[in-house]
Amino acid sequence: MSGLSLKECVPCRGGVPPLTGEEIAKLLPELDGWEVVNEHHLKKSYRFSNFREAQVFVNRVGDLAEEQGHHPDICFGWGNAEISIWTHKIDGLTESDFILAAKIDKL
């Protein structure tokens, strides 16, 4: 679906500006079902048949996050998981957030 999933997340050292609304609008169509909240973070909810499926998914996301060196906020429970992604060092969105979201969708 997206070339974003083929890229690698780049570590943010801070001091860079977050993406603008225009830049976000160009990247968002490359993602499937993600929403942008207040031009600050990406968010997506997932549904599963039971707790175990949600847990397995969350563990896979955690492994991916470690590989990429870019870590989302994850909340999950019986049959659901919610992922929020932003670059904490700049308290906003970077291309790496979109890359991670695209990679999560390929799991």
Where on the chain are the PLM-derived regions?
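Long, contiguous binding/interaction regions
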Residues: M1-D32, V37-L107
